[in-house]
Amino acid sequence: MSSESDKKLEIRLASPRGFCAGVERAIETVKLALKEHGEPVYVLHEIVHNRHVIDNLRQGGAVFVEELEQIPAGAICIFSAHGVSLQIEKRAKALGLKTIDATCPLVSSVHRMVEKYHAEGCSVVIIGHHRHPEVEGTAGRVTGEVYVVATAAEAEKLQVNNSEKIAFVTQTTLAENDIEQVLVVLRRRFPLLQGPKSNICFATQNRQNAVRTLARCTDLILVVGSKNSSNSNRLREVGTETGTPAYLIDDFKDLKESWFRGCERVGITAGASAPESLVEGVVVWLLKRGRYEITEMTGQQEKVHFKAASLID
C-alpha cells in the first residue's frame, strides 16, 4: 500500500461502535467508587473485557482480583458488568465486604427471567458460551435444573427431567444466527419450550447490524476489541459470514501491512468494551500509509444511559 497510489482509498467507520451503555455504566461505577471512597477499590474479575480499560482503571487505583478471599474485610468490592451468582453475593456479605453491583441492567433482566422460570418449576436452558462470566453468573442465580448449551450439536444431546416445563434464555452478546441454530433444535425436541423473543441486548444487535452494512461496502473489516470479548468476536464472525475478510485486533499494534494489499475500502468497528481512542489509533496508522478519505457511516442512534451503581445496603 503506497501513499503515492492514485487509487481512491477509503476508511469507513461503523455506527454505532465501541462502548455500550452497560460498559459505560460499569466504568463510571468504578471511577465514582474511587472518587467517593478513595483507593483501593477492589473489582471481582475484569469490570469489562478490554485490557486497555483495565490498565487505565488500575492506574487510577482499582485492584482487580479473581477471588473474593483476596479482598480485605470491610473493603469495597465491585461486581463486574457480566454479573455474578447468588453464591458470590452471599459469600461477599459473609466476608464483610461492602459491595457495589455494576452488572449491566440488561444482564440483570435476564437474571430476573431465569428466577421467574425457576419459580414456575421450569428447567432452564441458557444458550451461551461455557465458562463465560455472564453465563456463569446467570446460571448461578438459582439452584436446580439449569443447563448451558452452546451449539446445535449440544442441543441435540440435551437431556432434561421434565420436557413439558422447559424455558430458555440467552447470553446477551451472542450473534442472532448462532442462537437461531440452537433454537431450531430445541424447539423440535421440546415443543413446549418457553422463552423470550430475544435476550440479545440492543447494543449487541445494533453493532452486528452495522457490521453487516459495513461488509457490503468494504474490502476488509477491522474489529477493535480484546480476544476475550464475546461481542467483539461475534462482530468479527458476522463480518466473515458475509464473505468480507475481518480481523479482531487489540489495537493498531496488531495490524499487518499484508492485509491491505489491493484493499481500497477499509471498514472499522469496535466491540462494546473498546474505547474510541483505540479506533483513533488504527485510523492514524492507516493515514500514515495511504491517502484515505474517512466516512462515518449512518446507523442506529443510541441514547440510552444507565446511572452508575452505588453501595448495596
Curated annotation (Swiss-Prot):
<feature type="binding site">
    <location>
        <position position="273"/>
    </location>
    <ligand>
        <name>(2E)-4-hydroxy-3-methylbut-2-enyl diphosphate</name>
    </ligand>
</feature>
<feature type="binding site">
    <location>
        <position position="132"/>
    </location>
    <ligand>
        <name>(2E)-4-hydroxy-3-methylbut-2-enyl diphosphate</name>
    </ligand>
</feature>
<feature type="binding site">
    <location>
        <position position="82"/>
    </location>
    <ligand>
        <name>dimethylallyl diphosphate</name>
    </ligand>
</feature>
<feature type="binding site">
    <location>
        <position position="201"/>
    </location>
    <ligand>
        <name>[4Fe-4S] cluster</name>
    </ligand>
</feature>
<feature type="binding site">
    <location>
        <position position="230"/>
    </location>
    <ligand>
        <name>isopentenyl diphosphate</name>
    </ligand>
</feature>
<protein>
    <recommendedName>
        <fullName>4-hydroxy-3-methylbut-2-enyl diphosphate reductase</fullName>
        <ecNumber>1.17.7.4</ecNumber>
    </recommendedName>
</protein>
<feature type="binding site">
    <location>
        <position position="82"/>
    </location>
    <ligand>
        <name>isopentenyl diphosphate</name>
    </ligand>
</feature>
<comment type="similarity">
    <text>Belongs to the IspH family.</text>
</comment>
<feature type="binding site">
    <location>
        <position position="231"/>
    </location>
    <ligand>
        <name>(2E)-4-hydroxy-3-methylbut-2-enyl diphosphate</name>
    </ligand>
</feature>
<keyword id="KW-0560">Oxidoreductase</keyword>
<comment type="pathway">
    <text>Isoprenoid biosynthesis; dimethylallyl diphosphate biosynthesis; dimethylallyl diphosphate from (2E)-4-hydroxy-3-methylbutenyl diphosphate: step 1/1.</text>
</comment>
<feature type="binding site">
    <location>
        <position position="20"/>
    </location>
    <ligand>
        <name>[4Fe-4S] cluster</name>
    </ligand>
</feature>
<feature type="binding site">
    <location>
        <position position="229"/>
    </location>
    <ligand>
        <name>isopentenyl diphosphate</name>
    </ligand>
</feature>
<dbReference type="GO" id="GO:0046872">
    <property type="term" value="F:metal ion binding"/>
</dbReference>
<keyword id="KW-0414">Isoprene biosynthesis</keyword>
<feature type="binding site">
    <location>
        <position position="273"/>
    </location>
    <ligand>
        <name>dimethylallyl diphosphate</name>
    </ligand>
</feature>
<feature type="active site" description="Proton donor">
    <location>
        <position position="134"/>
    </location>
</feature>
<feature type="binding site">
    <location>
        <position position="172"/>
    </location>
    <ligand>
        <name>(2E)-4-hydroxy-3-methylbut-2-enyl diphosphate</name>
    </ligand>
</feature>
<keyword id="KW-0479">Metal-binding</keyword>
<dbReference type="GO" id="GO:0051745">
    <property type="term" value="F:4-hydroxy-3-methylbut-2-enyl diphosphate reductase activity"/>
</dbReference>
<feature type="binding site">
    <location>
        <position position="82"/>
    </location>
    <ligand>
        <name>(2E)-4-hydroxy-3-methylbut-2-enyl diphosphate</name>
    </ligand>
</feature>
<feature type="binding site">
    <location>
        <position position="231"/>
    </location>
    <ligand>
        <name>isopentenyl diphosphate</name>
    </ligand>
</feature>
<keyword id="KW-0411">Iron-sulfur</keyword>
<dbReference type="GO" id="GO:0019288">
    <property type="term" value="P:isopentenyl diphosphate biosynthetic process, methylerythritol 4-phosphate pathway"/>
</dbReference>
<comment type="pathway">
    <text>Isoprenoid biosynthesis; isopentenyl diphosphate biosynthesis via DXP pathway; isopentenyl diphosphate from 1-deoxy-D-xylulose 5-phosphate: step 6/6.</text>
</comment>
<feature type="binding site">
    <location>
        <position position="104"/>
    </location>
    <ligand>
        <name>[4Fe-4S] cluster</name>
    </ligand>
</feature>
<keyword id="KW-0004">4Fe-4S</keyword>
<dbReference type="InterPro" id="IPR003451">
    <property type="entry name" value="LytB/IspH"/>
</dbReference>
<feature type="binding site">
    <location>
        <position position="49"/>
    </location>
    <ligand>
        <name>dimethylallyl diphosphate</name>
    </ligand>
</feature>
<feature type="binding site">
    <location>
        <position position="49"/>
    </location>
    <ligand>
        <name>isopentenyl diphosphate</name>
    </ligand>
</feature>
<feature type="binding site">
    <location>
        <position position="273"/>
    </location>
    <ligand>
        <name>isopentenyl diphosphate</name>
    </ligand>
</feature>
<feature type="binding site">
    <location>
        <position position="49"/>
    </location>
    <ligand>
        <name>(2E)-4-hydroxy-3-methylbut-2-enyl diphosphate</name>
    </ligand>
</feature>
<feature type="binding site">
    <location>
        <position position="132"/>
    </location>
    <ligand>
        <name>dimethylallyl diphosphate</name>
    </ligand>
</feature>
<dbReference type="GO" id="GO:0016114">
    <property type="term" value="P:terpenoid biosynthetic process"/>
</dbReference>
<feature type="binding site">
    <location>
        <position position="229"/>
    </location>
    <ligand>
        <name>dimethylallyl diphosphate</name>
    </ligand>
</feature>
<dbReference type="Pfam" id="PF02401">
    <property type="entry name" value="LYTB"/>
</dbReference>
<feature type="binding site">
    <location>
        <position position="230"/>
    </location>
    <ligand>
        <name>(2E)-4-hydroxy-3-methylbut-2-enyl diphosphate</name>
    </ligand>
</feature>
<feature type="binding site">
    <location>
        <position position="230"/>
    </location>
    <ligand>
        <name>dimethylallyl diphosphate</name>
    </ligand>
</feature>
<feature type="binding site">
    <location>
        <position position="229"/>
    </location>
    <ligand>
        <name>(2E)-4-hydroxy-3-methylbut-2-enyl diphosphate</name>
    </ligand>
</feature>
<feature type="binding site">
    <location>
        <position position="231"/>
    </location>
    <ligand>
        <name>dimethylallyl diphosphate</name>
    </ligand>
</feature>
<feature type="binding site">
    <location>
        <position position="132"/>
    </location>
    <ligand>
        <name>isopentenyl diphosphate</name>
    </ligand>
</feature>
<dbReference type="GO" id="GO:0050992">
    <property type="term" value="P:dimethylallyl diphosphate biosynthetic process"/>
</dbReference>
